[in-house]
Amino acid sequence: MQIQDRFMSPQWKARFKGYVQVTKPGIIFGNLISVAGGFLLAAKGDVNLVLMLASLVGLSLVVASGCAINNCIDRDIDAKMQRTCKRVTVTGEIAVGNVLAFGLALGVLGFSILALFTNALALLFAVIGYIVYVGVYSLYMKRNSVYGTLVGSFSGAVPPVVGYCSVTGQMDMGAAILLLMFSLWQMPHSYAIAIFRFNDYAAANIPVLPVAEGMTKAKLHIVLYIAVFALVSALLPLAGYTGIAFMAVTCATSLWWLAMALKGYRHGVDMQRWARQVFGFSIITITALSVTMALDFQVVSQAPLLTLVK
């Protein structure tokens, strides 16, 4: 009874909630959708449920690990931002050392699952994505360079490629398109956040594009990246990996997103409201494409660009 009372206590519940929050569940959920999309696109209807579950769980734990460690690294700048100033690593509700140990444990477990159940190429992409996010982006680029978003976009594009390569074991044209497509999507998505969170980033002296080089350049980059994203997304059906349904969805969502981005050039536009709309529709776009490519796959024969034997 004493053990049960302990786990039901408000203090324990708050502590448990804090550990969950440092893993950023929203980011994990978004990555789950993209991993599943990449996996099912590659599986082409022949789904190994054990492999799929291992890919989803393993990658989710790796993402959770990266997010937890990012909380530790960013605690000084998080303290300066209204959105993040109440994170447990800032308030001290949970010791930074405990969060770091928790994050490392999640990473070990996640990578172990990927190593045991997937293949060397899927594991390699997960490792590279993790190193880029934690080691390159979080530790240095985010704080010191306007190109931090560009570097971080690679790690954000890794999950669907891990899902895809878990099935194929090779880096073919389909995997390359996914990597480029999701990297391009990250840019306007992130710049939109930087615009409607402008004051936070400025207060923390983080050199995101709107802060470092102005709103005008950020708006232009958003429009250009969405336009290129639309073209790259169309390569999946053009290369025969998906069918007409994916082409219809990618054209509809990408063009609507582009039209929404162009509204940023209207005279007197409310930049905060506009950026939130661009951000919100970016999530709708990538979710719709992930779901559609999982359902509208086509059987193609492609020579691998890279193959690693497990």
From Swiss-Prot:
Q: Where is it mostly found? A: membrane
Q: What is its EC number?
A: 2.5.1.141
Among NCBIfam families, the record links this protein to: cyoE_ctaB (TIGR01473), PRK04375.1-1 (NF003348)
Gene Ontology MF annotations: protoheme IX farnesyltransferase activity
Read off the PANTHER family from this record: PROTOHEME IX FARNESYLTRANSFERASE, MITOCHONDRIAL (PTHR43448:SF2)
> Which Pfam family, just one, is annotated for this protein?
UbiA
Q: What name does the UniProt record give this protein?
A: Protoheme IX farnesyltransferase 2
Catalytic activity annotated for this protein? Answer: heme b + (2E,6E)-farnesyl diphosphate + H2O = Fe(II)-heme o + diphosphate
Q: Alphabetically list the UniProt keywords.
A: Cell inner membrane, Cell membrane, Heme biosynthesis, Membrane, Transferase, Transmembrane, Transmembrane helix
Residue ranges annotated as coiled coil are: none
Family that this chain belongs to: Belongs to the UbiA prenyltransferase family. Protoheme IX farnesyltransferase subfamily.
UniProt GO BP: heme O biosynthetic process
Q: Where found?
A: Cell inner membrane
The way it spans or sits in the membrane comes to: Multi-pass membrane protein
Which residue ranges does UniProt annotate as crossing the membrane? 25-45, 49-69, 87-107, 120-139, 145-165, 176-196, 220-240, 242-262, 277-297
Other comments? Carbon 2 of the heme B porphyrin ring is defined according to the Fischer nomenclature.
What pathway, per the record?
Porphyrin-containing compound metabolism; heme O biosynthesis; heme O from protoheme: step 1/1
Q: Which GO terms describe its cellular component?
A: plasma membrane
Stored InterPro entries: Protohaem_IX_farnesylTrfase, UbiA_prenyltransferase, UbiA_prenylTrfase_CS, UbiA_sf
Q: What is this protein for, i.e. what is its function?
A: Converts heme B (protoheme IX) to heme O by substitution of the vinyl group on carbon 2 of heme B porphyrin ring with a hydroxyethyl farnesyl side group.
